[in-house]
């Protein structure tokens, strides 16, 4: 208000200093034009439209009554719109907050979610989810391994049973009932351990082979084992007829002396010489052992290692048989290589010396 009054004061003085013209009346000296309030002052004061109309600036400094009235009106109008301006400001703040909230929601949706906004939040979320995923993955791996082992056992049992049934069925269909019976009995045959002596690098080695009882080598070995105890048993001496013992004579015998004589009993066969066990051992020792080359010796050592059940478990033996016979078909080159590497690592860890 003071700035408005000060700005209008020079205008009133200039009007008073101007000379009176012939067209002006005597009342022009007392005329003071009303000053319009500036837009800047109205904006700074925050007055509403009603306050703008009530503000009136006077140019006459001597009129104290008009100045006091104007000051009172200005104070009243300034007090009245204060609450309205505060409410308007609060409404503006609420609208701005709502707009900011909506804008943030749009940014979150465009970024792909709340967890992708900040790097720290994203890393913390990834670390927490990674630990949970690791535990879940370990449990899933263990469950898959157990399931695969169970399925492998079932497949192996079904394949062994189906192969034997197919052979028996084929033999029965062709009318070869003897071979069908042989195959059915072979499935239940017991294995026979046969010692084998061989020579390698100037040294004698003895290995044990497990063969079915129907194998020719097994039959030969069993026949030799049966013949050796039979030869060692002593045969009972045959009773010899005593020539010194006279036969009792009777009247009937004398009367029938003229009749043809009865046939004489057969003479006992001469006894064979009993072979000693030492001769059998010497014969076995004098037999020339089989000479092996490096490849045959390696194969024999590998077979001996596989036959030792104290070093390999049944599951490892089954896996070894599967890999040896089938060669990892259908698994792919890399898959078969990884399976073999894992198997060899397990065997190495199991058989490692402390």
Swiss-Prot record:
Residues 272-354 form the BCNT-C domain. Residues 1-11 have a biased composition (Polar residues). Pfam families: BCNT. One of its GO terms (biological process) is chromatin remodeling. InterPro entries: BCNT-C (IPR011421), Swc5/CFDP1/2 (IPR027124). One of its GO terms (cellular component) is Swr1 complex. Residues 1-93, 109-134, 222-292 are annotated as: Disordered. Keywords: Activator, Chromatin regulator, Nucleus, Transcription, Transcription regulation. Residues 223-261, 276-292 have a biased composition (Low complexity). Residues 24-33, 60-70 have a biased composition (Acidic residues). Its main location: nucleus. It comes from the Eukaryota. The keyword Coiled coil does not apply. The keyword DNA-binding does not apply. Component of the SWR1 complex which mediates the ATP-dependent exchange of histone H2A for the H2A variant HZT1 leading to transcriptional regulation of selected genes by chromatin remodeling. Involved in chromosome stability. Belongs to the SWC5 family. Component of the SWR1 chromatin remodeling complex. This is SWR1-complex protein 5. It comes from Mycosarcoma maydis (Corn smut fungus).
């Amino acid at each position: 208000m003071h700035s408005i009054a000060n700005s209008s004061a020079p205008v009133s003085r200039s009007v008073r200093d101007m000379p009176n013209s012939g067209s002006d009346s005597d009342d022009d000296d007392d005329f003071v034009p009303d000053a319009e309030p500036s837009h800047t002052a109205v904006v700074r004061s925050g007055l509403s439209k009603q306050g703008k109309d009530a503000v009136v600036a006077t140019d006459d400094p001597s009129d104290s009554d008009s100045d006091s009235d104007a000051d009172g009106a200005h104070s009243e109008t300034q007090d009245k719109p204060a609450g309205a301006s505060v409410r308007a400001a609060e409404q503006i703040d609420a609208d701005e907050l709502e707009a900011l909230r909506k804008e943030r929601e749009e940014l979150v949706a465009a970024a792909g979610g709340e967890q992708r906004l900040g790097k720290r939040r994203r890393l913390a979320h990834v670390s927490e989810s990674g630990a949970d995923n690791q535990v879940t993955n370990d449990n899933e791996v263990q469950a898959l391994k157990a399931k695969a082992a169970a399925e492998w056992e079932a497949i192996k049992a079904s394949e062994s049973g189906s192969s034997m049934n197919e052979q028996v069925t084929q033999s029965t269909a062709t009318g070869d009932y003897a071979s069908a019976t042989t195959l059915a009995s072979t499935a239940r045959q017991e294995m026979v351990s046969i010692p084998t002596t061989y020579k390698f690098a100037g040294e004698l080695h003895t290995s044990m082979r497990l063969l079915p009882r129907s194998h020719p080598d097994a039959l030969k070995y069993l026949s030799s084992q049966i013949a050796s105890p039979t030869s060692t048993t002593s045969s009972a001496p045959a009773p010899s007829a005593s020539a010194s013992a006279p036969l009792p004579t009777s009247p009937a015998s004398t009367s029938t002396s003229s009749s043809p004589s009865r046939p004489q009993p057969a003479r006992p066969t001469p006894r064979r010489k009993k072979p000693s066990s030492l001769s059998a051992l010497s014969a076995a020792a004098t037999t020339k052992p089989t000479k092996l080359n490096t490849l045959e010796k390696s194969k024999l050592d590998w077979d001996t290692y596989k036959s030792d059940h104290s070093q390999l478990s049944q599951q490892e033996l089954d896996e070894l048989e599967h890999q040896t016979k089938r060669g990892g078909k259908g698994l792919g080159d890399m898959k078969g290589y990884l399976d073999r590497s894992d198997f060899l690592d397990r065997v190495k860890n199991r058989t490692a010396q402390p």
